[in-house]
Amino acid sequence: MYKHILVPTDGSDLAQSTVAKAIEIAKETGAQITVITVSHPFHASIIEPMRVKDTLDTHDRQAEDTAAAILGRASAAARAVDVNCSTVHVRHESAHVAITEVANQNGCDLIIMALNRHRGISAVLHESETVLVLKHCTVPMLIV
């Protein structure tokens, strides 16, 4: 059935439940999973030039620490049930682009994502990353 499942996560409760579901599906099908988290690069727009390096270093360190914690939890959950799991941390302006690129580069045959529904004016102004991946990626998706 599926051989390689990509699971994007931001560490939220909703994303963590999606990771758990992906692990369950991988266990049932014998698939391996790749868990990805995407962090945005640092932008130094109004920071004093002398402080940019310190701020950049702090931002990078925090992004790495956060990603390591998120991916570590996912990897441990997969290992606990003997599911082959790799992890990827990508810095990119657009999470949906990074997700699509990693899915294609790794030969993933399924992406499992949660749908975080926006309501009211927010729904008009913001498309969810899930919807953007659906629009731009040719890899089949399971929305949970």
Regions found by a protein language model. Name each.
Residues T18, S45-E48, V97-T100, A123-L125:
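Short, well-ordered secondary-structure micro-motifs
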Residues M50-D54, A103-N106, E129-V131:
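Short, hinge-like loop/turn segments at secondary-structure boundaries
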Residues A76-I111:
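Structural beta-alpha unit
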Residues L110-H136:
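Glycine-rich, Arg-bearing micro-motifs that act as flexible, cationic patches
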